[in-house]
Structure formats: C-alpha cells, structure tokens
Amino acid sequence: MEEFDIREATPEDAEKIIAYLAQVGGETDYLSFGKEGLPISAEEEEKFIQNINKEEHSVLYVVWKNGEIIGDASLSGFSRRMSHRAEFGISVVKSEWGQGIGSALLQKCIMYAKEHAIELINLEVRSDNIRAIHVYEKYSFRKIGTSPAYYKMDGTYYDFDLMVLDLRRERR
C-alpha cells in the first residue's frame, strides 16, 4: 500500500481542495454535492480555511498522496452552550476506498476532539451508505435517529441516519 500523509489544511491548499471536491462529488451520490463541487471560489476557500484554523473547536484535514488530495475530513465546532459538540464530515476519492484512509481520518478527528474538550461528535450519513455506517460503528458511533426524506436527488428522496460518538464515557 502506498503511503499517504494527513495534515491540517492551509490557505495554500484552497485550489487543490476545490478541484478535489469536484472530483469526489462526481464519484459518489453520498455527498451533498455532485461533480460541480461546491459553489465557492479559491479566495472564499482560503478565507474559510483561515477561519477554521483560528477556531478552537474546528479542524479541516486533507490527505495527500503523490502531490494530490485524496481525502478530507472536518470537525466543525460550535460556540457557547454547544461548545462541547462538533459536526463530523468526510470524503475520500473512490479509488482509495477500502485502503484505511477513512479510518485514519476518523481516528485523527477523534484525537483532535479529545485534545480540545469536544465531548460529542455528531454526523449525518445516508441510511443506505452501509460501508460508512460500518466504519462509524467500528469507532463506537451509535445511531440516534433517522431523518426521513433528508436528501433529494433526481426526484428520489433518501433518509439520513443521525449518529453520535459520546467521548464523555472515556473521561469517567
């Protein structure tokens, strides 16, 4: 297996991240966007990364292999009364599925959460994304509900499962 490197995103990564998002969006229907990527310019992405890097409870990781981004994951924290929570998001290029990259990203985000006093990690996953759900369950995420017709694509509705990892149990 070829080596990959996970690190925090920097503003200099913005253009590569935008290209990556267009690629990964075109490879799967499990994301909220398609091959058009996200409607954001390189300058807007740079500012987004700068803001994330300033926030105490948020992080954006990118996975590099052979000079290209092949995955990303984020924790988006909240303020005040919800500062003990963060929302998790992840994507990996299809050619790298099953290579442990998603698990490595998830481990990195869990470690970040523990180091930054984040007690609950929430995520939303399409209910038929069995591969992702299996990985989340392996890391002790539990399903707390289902949001029906959460997502609509080409006239078809898809349910999403809401899952949470409770890190408070580990602190007791």
Model-derived regions, located:
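Glycine-rich phosphate/pyrophosphate-binding loop shared by adenosine-nucleotide-utilizing enzymes
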Residues: 2-4, 66-72, 158
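A short beta-loop-alpha structural element at the N-terminal edge
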Residues: 5-19
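Helix-loop element at the rim of GNAT/NAT acetyltransferase active sites that forms part
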Residues: 19-36
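Acetyl-CoA-dependent GNAT
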Residues: 25, 37-94, 106-107, 166-170
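Active-site acidic-Proline motif in GNAT/NAT acetyltransferases
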Residues: 90-95, 99, 127-128
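Conserved acetyl-CoA-binding loop-helix of GNAT-fold acetyltransferases
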Residues: 98-111, 115, 134-138
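Conserved GNAT acetyl-CoA-binding A-motif
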Residues: 113-124
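Conserved catalytic-core motifs of GNAT/GCN5-like acyltransferases
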Residues: 122-125, 137-159
